[in-house]
């Protein structure tokens, strides 16, 4: 059986402001009813393909579990990284887990946030790649370069009579080129876009990783030994993983190994890595415009207009991207959308929170939506799922007022436990130990008014939490060196 390894740790910053660090693009429904993450797993349900291993950031654990449960999709485990260290360590942890379990199978490594339109073409490429991988080769899926795209890395192929027909040896990896050089690649032929998809046997990858980047290999061995398992979730040891070098599969292994080969894949692939890529994969109107939401377009061509609540009207635009969300708007020329990543970096440096979360934030117990905020107050609309509860917690700098809009709330405030129903309210003083729970069968909705000198989400001390959310040593400011000792 072939085992997919879904890499779901990306931040998707080039699709800001829709994609945020705490809710990145792989968890958004950008090209259909289901999210990119869900689509990735759905397209791998066919004969000969086992259920996948998912590698994700710890902050996305509950999003992954919810999106899997929503479609009744199964996995054989979730590897939870405390923070990203690029793709080489992520794949190494998955490979080591399989080998340790006596399952030295072929691993199909693929990102969670790509689009593939032609399922049959994908399966044909997989069949060809399997022949090479069974012989010990390390296969990369290359998309034939049909235009001078500057947002992708390129692969140059060469013939090798020892490889199966249709499989080529990788002669060269090329960094993202400028437009002139990219055009030369397309004209020359034999160049492919690097899809970021790979196929190899688990033990072969580990053998090559140990040979070419022993620091990653050794650190991952130790991190796996120290990891904690809870059901199907493996939490990678934070202190050890912090010492792991940050490197991609390409740099750590594929550019150094003598076994790298490429299989052509013409399957309607896109990494939807920027707004112009997303425009390309969508259906367009007669003027080449792509619109979503409450949008009115007049005398405009080849635009991407995305509304999310407000009416967005545009007049006389051409090749422009407009994205509106509740708390941010981004306007860019389609030729300049690669600059969105730098814009996000600039906003981060300015301490802007709009890069981290949407106003509506999802939690394992439900969600909250920031309705209004001032210097010493914040108003939230909180929804708690039936049977769910927030952690038993305390805030050092803020008090809270709760008003029930619908449903029934079970409130714990210090030693008191009581019920509130629609239109009833209560007050939670600063430093009171409290909890909100929904004992009913319908969603609980409340309005929460916070007031105090500091209203950040990190002003929280948890005493009990059914979801296992506890402060980590690094979050408490303890150094990695101290932990390692």
Curated annotation (Swiss-Prot):
Family annotation (CDD domains): cupin_PMI_typeII_C, GDP-M1P_Guanylyltransferase
Coiled-coil blocks: none
SUPFAM superfamilies referenced in this protein's UniProt entry, alphabetically: Nucleotide-diphospho-sugar transferases (SSF53448), RmlC-like cupins (SSF51182)
One Gene Ontology term of the molecular function aspect: mannose-6-phosphate isomerase activity
Cofactor: Co(2+)
InterPro entries linked to this entry: GMPP_N, Man1P_GuaTrfase/Man6P_Isoase, Man6P_isomerase-2_C, ManC/GMP-like_b-helix, Mannose-6P_isomerase_type2, NTP_transferase_dom, Nucleotide-diphossugar_trans, RmlC-like_jellyroll
UniProt entry keywords in alphabetical sequence: Alginate biosynthesis, Cobalt, GTP-binding, Isomerase, Multifunctional enzyme, Nucleotide-binding, Nucleotidyltransferase, Transferase
Reaction catalysis annotation: D-mannose 6-phosphate = D-fructose 6-phosphate; alpha-D-mannose 1-phosphate + GTP + H(+) = GDP-alpha-D-mannose + diphosphate
Gene Ontology process terms (BP): alginic acid biosynthetic process; GDP-mannose biosynthetic process
UniProt-listed Enzyme Commission number(s): 5.3.1.8, 2.7.7.13
CC cofactor note: Co(2+) (for PMI).
Pathway connected to this protein: Nucleotide-sugar biosynthesis; GDP-alpha-D-mannose biosynthesis; GDP-alpha-D-mannose from alpha-D-mannose 1-phosphate (GTP route): step 1/1; Nucleotide-sugar biosynthesis; GDP-alpha-D-mannose biosynthesis; alpha-D-mannose 1-phosphate from D-fructose 6-phosphate: step 1/2
PANTHER family recorded: MANNOSE-1-PHOSPHATE GUANYLYLTRANSFERASE (PTHR46390:SF1)
NCBIfam families cross-referenced by the UniProt entry: GMP_PMI
Subunit structure: Monomer.
Family as reported in the entry's similarity comment: Belongs to the mannose-6-phosphate isomerase type 2 family.
Function, as annotated: Produces a precursor for alginate polymerization. The alginate layer provides a protective barrier against host immune defenses and antibiotics.
UniProt protein name: Alginate biosynthesis protein AlgA
Protein source organism: Pseudomonas putida (strain ATCC 47054 / DSM 6125 / CFBP 8728 / NCIMB 11950 / KT2440)
